[in-house]
Design a protein with these regions (language model features):
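A short beta-loop-alpha structural element at the N-terminal edge
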Residues: 3-17
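Conserved GNAT-fold acetyl-CoA-binding loop/helix
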Residues: 20-49
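Conserved beta-hairpin
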Residues: 57-70
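A short, internal acetyl-CoA/4′-phosphopantetheine-binding micro-motif in the GNAT/acyltransferase core
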Residues: 78-89, 112-113
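Conserved acetyl-CoA-binding loop-helix of GNAT-fold acetyltransferases
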Residues: 90-103, 121, 125
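Conserved GNAT acetyl-CoA-binding A-motif
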Residues: 103-115
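Conserved catalytic-core motifs of GNAT/GCN5-like acyltransferases
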Residues: 111-113, 129-146
Length: 149
């Protein structure tokens, strides 16, 4: 039976895999920095960061049905990260994690890449609305937009 539970250090490898795969899938097409996405950004280093920095896991919840398929990280009222393993997207996992963040942690805002239309649609289905706030991503032409409930 699927469960949403608090992440543990033992989840570090899956958290890192899911995050890396999503970064490459969702952000590489816009930022196209090969050295970062395919060298600096790697599962081994991120897994170690999860293990070495308990604050990365402290407010992270995983969707687990025998295999960790996605996770959400909350920072105060912000949904800081929400990722589902690409192979399992479209099965309601992201929505379940989002509902958990809203109901159990009081999350009510997030930042999302303006061009990530799929994520924006998911958030809108769960009561989030785009605001006028936009933040340029470093020295790029890309923007993060704020969504609130």
């Amino acid at each position: 039976m699927p469960a949403i539970r608090k992440a543990t250090r033992g989840d570090a490898c899956r958290l890192a895999e899911i995050e890396i795969f999503n970064y490459r899938l969702n952000f590489y097409p816009y930022f196209r920095t090969d050295a970062y996405f395919f060298s600096e950004l790697n599962v081994s280093a991120l897994m170690q960061a999860y293990r070495d920095m308990p604050e990365r896991i402290e407010h992270t919840f995983v969707y687990d049905d025998g295999v960790v398929k996605g996770f959400v990280r909350i920072n105060g009222a912000e949904i800081e990260k929400l990722f589902v393993e690409p192979a399992f997207q479209g099965q309601g996992i992201g929505g379940a994690l989002l509902d958990h963040a809203i109901r159990h942690a009081g999350a009510d805002w997030l930042l999302v890449l303006e061009k990530n239309e799929g994520a924006i649609r998911l958030y809108e289905r769960h009561g989030f609305r785009l605001t006028e706030q936009r933040h340029r991503v470093d020295d790029t032409e890309e923007y993060l937009v704020r969504m609130e409930r």
